[in-house]
Amino acid sequence: MKVCQKSIVRFLVSLIIGTFVISVPFMANAQSDRELRAVWIASVLNIDWPSKKGLSVKEQKQEYIKLLDDVQKMGMNAVIVQIKPTADAFYPSAYGPWSEYLTGVQGKDPGYDPLAFMIEETHKRNLEFHAWFNPYRITMNHTDLNKLSEDHPARKHPDWVAAYGNQLYYHPGIPEARDFIVKGIEEVVKHYDIDAVHMDDYFYPYKIAGQEFPDQAQYEQYGKDAFSNIDDWRRDNVNQLVKQINQTIKAAKPYVKFGISPFGVWRNAADDPTGSNTKAGVRNYDDLYADTRHWIQEGDIDYIAPQIYWSIGFNAAAYDVLADWWSNEVKNRPVHLYIGQAAYKINNNFDPPWSDPEEYVRQITLNRQLELVKGSMHFSLKDLNKNPLGIKDSLSTDLYSKPALVPQMPWLDNTAPKKPKLTKVTEDKNGNLLQIKDHPSNQKTKETAYYAIYRAEGKKQRTLLATQRKTHEQQTFLDNTADPNKKYTYYVTSADRLHNESKASKRTTK
């Protein structure tokens, strides 16, 4: 894969994507061939997977495969899997013990490599795998270092650890701790075939009334000379982490994306005239010390997915107001905007719109009216699988009924593979069998990650039928939805792992 010169490509992409956000009411629910459709799979507290601690290897694998089947049926094209929820790991690691959410005992080997297994199964289905890290959090419900596994890095470096509320965290302001966190992420990037590194909204912890995060001593040691106040120093600590992670990822594998899903409000307009027209009680900039604007403007992330977990028209923080505000934040920037959707609130919240079956549909419809919103991330799979107010059905039969490719990121790579050869289309009792052969140059460079198969009936416009992961230089695809009485033209393209598509090879049935 060819990787472009960063500065030149970022400038060109800015020209391409620097368009005004417009509404297109008559295309309200139109599905695009390009849209991220991702879902979070949380491991912390066994929210999504594994469903409980101590399952056998066979049970864990069966559960994950079943979840992927559910994801496919809903028309998704990416999963965001939490692989480091509490300074631990779902893979053998030099930077954290085995997670207790696997076996019930922190540090206990589960008997296989869950991350390798998950990536393999995910890619079989041609879904993206976003590896989800929580950088600072060490515990969920205690502050006793002695309860951690004996080999836990936090026990070896207690000076890196801060207790706040009833939890332990790595100090964001200690350079050695920051380097350690980054190396832990680098370990995964280098050793596993992930598509993206993902972080959520947990940076400095959400504030607790009457309690100050205990980092005054660290500020005196590391920050006082450069920063006149502790808040600016805290923001710089997070900014440095974000930049360092991105630089480390790109040095190892330039095609691996880096994205963050922050809290839904940067600042209120009352705090900053360029902030959103909201009255949120929590703000990224002021409370979590997460300056999302800085990351976007510095090009330190490839995507941002604000968690806009409120209804359209909600007084304190309206979904529609924030979706538009975030669209303006990424305008003219080589950063994709996805929206974090609150599936967990459907029919489960005090705010009346969440009891309306159409609220979630309206939110996704609104996203599609905003040109710079490139898709959605849903929290979480467990909630979607409950099918509240029929949302799972709505996704599979309506909103996501047609497949979609993940949007390209031309600032990372904009060179498409050579087109494959659709050598034959054979009709049989099971449907139409397509025989696909990759272009010889793609075989040498391993450019092709998957094939996109399109179909046109008669003189109608072609539509995306499916995608298929490349497994061999020659492989087949069965269209079992074909009507034997109709004539079709099939088009096949090769796509690389950043979703750049080749020209199409085509054949028509007799």
Curated annotation (Swiss-Prot):
<comment type="similarity">
    <text>Belongs to the glycosyl hydrolase-like 10 (GHL10) family.</text>
</comment>
<feature type="signal peptide">
    <location>
        <begin position="1"/>
        <end position="30"/>
    </location>
</feature>
<dbReference type="InterPro" id="IPR003790">
    <property type="entry name" value="GHL10"/>
</dbReference>
<dbReference type="Pfam" id="PF02638">
    <property type="entry name" value="GHL10"/>
</dbReference>
<dbReference type="InterPro" id="IPR017853">
    <property type="entry name" value="Glycoside_hydrolase_SF"/>
</dbReference>
<dbReference type="GO" id="GO:0016798">
    <property type="term" value="F:hydrolase activity, acting on glycosyl bonds"/>
</dbReference>
<keyword id="KW-0732">Signal</keyword>
<keyword id="KW-0378">Hydrolase</keyword>
<dbReference type="InterPro" id="IPR013783">
    <property type="entry name" value="Ig-like_fold"/>
</dbReference>
<keyword id="KW-0326">Glycosidase</keyword>
<dbReference type="InterPro" id="IPR052177">
    <property type="entry name" value="Divisome_Glycosyl_Hydrolase"/>
</dbReference>
<protein>
    <recommendedName>
        <fullName>Glycosyl hydrolase YngK</fullName>
        <ecNumber>3.2.1.-</ecNumber>
    </recommendedName>
</protein>
